[in-house]
């Protein structure tokens, strides 16, 4: 794959991983399922280090799948309603692509809030454990865009250019064959943020009095959103509200919220809980 990227042969083999009779396993679904499984195992490992029963994540992952995937789809459909108004059954064809991470974050956050209260867990400590798995899952899931030949950027002739089949090109750009692989940019960016969050997590384990509860969540919001603001500007298929790219507006808002959170934790409210408080579950 690396050789293909840098020798101009970078293109999707198609959306279907394999097919047996009438059953087709699509790469998009396989990658989402893989991200969920890998994320679950990572959460159990990190959660145990923070004093959370790993078995709780077996329940939480069901809550998240039930909440995040439908909300990601509905968020996308809401801003693309003209495409679905006359073919509303296509709303359920999620295997064809068309989900929005910000929608998933909204649904997932609500699910985590309800779950944490139901199980008497610290909401912010739970988020600090979950966010490294979330960003890793995003890095994996972005490759679904590659196999679907979607979510690419403007035409380019860079060595790592991505070939897009004629049928998937925008109508006004059919004469161009190669485009920015924005999915790849975001996947690599997310892996970098994942490395930062993991490093911060283990720094917190070694120096618990120096890490405030909620820090990792705030760093995630800032790190991921900064990359999304940049990458979204390259894409040709952004969800729009008038002249505004929705993902950029939301991402800028999340950067501001994450920055405000860091300021609040470390400058305005220095007596807030840090990681030295090990009682994460109320008995």
Curated annotation (Swiss-Prot):
Pathway: Protein modification; lipoprotein biosynthesis (diacylglyceryl transfer). The gene is lgt. Catalyzes the transfer of the diacylglyceryl group from phosphatidylglycerol to the sulfhydryl group of the N-terminal cysteine of a prolipoprotein, the first step in the formation of mature lipoproteins. Its EC number is 2.5.1.145. The chain crosses the membrane at residues 20-40, 60-80, 94-114, 121-141, 183-203, 214-234, 248-268. Pfam families: LGT. GO terms for biological process: lipoprotein biosynthetic process. It is a multi-pass membrane protein. PANTHER family: PHOSPHATIDYLGLYCEROL--PROLIPOPROTEIN DIACYLGLYCERYL TRANSFERASE (PTHR30589:SF0), PROLIPOPROTEIN DIACYLGLYCERYL TRANSFERASE (PTHR30589). One of its GO terms (molecular function) is phosphatidylglycerol-prolipoprotein diacylglyceryl transferase activity. HAMAP family: Lgt. Belongs to the Lgt family. Keywords: Cell inner membrane, Cell membrane, Membrane, Transferase, Transmembrane, Transmembrane helix. This is Phosphatidylglycerol--prolipoprotein diacylglyceryl transferase. The keyword Calcium does not apply. It is found in: Cell inner membrane. One of its GO terms (cellular component) is plasma membrane. A 1,2-diacyl-sn-glycero-3-phospho-(1'-sn-glycerol) binds at residue 142.
């Amino acid at each position: 794959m690396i050789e293909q990227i840098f020798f101009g042969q970078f293109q999707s083999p198609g959306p279907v991983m394999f097919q047996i009779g009438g059953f087709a396993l699509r790469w998009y679904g396989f990658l989402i399922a893989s991200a969920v499984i890998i994320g679950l195992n990572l959460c159990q490992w990190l959660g145990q280090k923070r004093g959370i029963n790993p078995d709780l994540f077996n329940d939480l992952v069901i809550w998240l799948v039930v909440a995040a995937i439908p909300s990601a789809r509905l968020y996308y459909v809401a801003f693309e309603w003209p495409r679905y108004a006359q073919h509303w059954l296509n709303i359920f064809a999620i295997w064809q692509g068309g989900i929005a991470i910000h929608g998933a974050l909204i649904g997932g956050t609500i699910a985590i809030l309800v779950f944490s209260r139901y199980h008497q867990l610290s909401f912010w400590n739970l988020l600090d454990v979950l966010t490294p798995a979330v960003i890793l899952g995003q890095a994996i899931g972005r490759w679904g865009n590659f196999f679907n030949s979607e979510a690419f950027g403007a035409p380019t002739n860079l060595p790592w250019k991505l070939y897009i089949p004629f049928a998937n090109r925008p109508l006004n750009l059919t004469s161009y064959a190669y485009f920015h692989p924005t999915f790849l940019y975001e996947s690599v960016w997310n892996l970098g943020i994942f490395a930062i969050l993991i490093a911060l997590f283990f720094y917190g384990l070694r120096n618990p009095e120096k890490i405030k509860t909620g820090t990792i969540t705030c760093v995630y919001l800032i790190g991921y959103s900064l990359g999304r603001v940049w990458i979204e500007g390259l894409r040709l298929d952004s969800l729009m509200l008038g002249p505004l790219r929705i993902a950029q507006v939301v991402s800028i808002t999340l950067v501001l919220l994450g920055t405000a959170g860091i300021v609040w934790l470390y400058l305005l409210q220095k007596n807030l809980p840090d990681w030295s408080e090990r009682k994460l579950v109320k008995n």
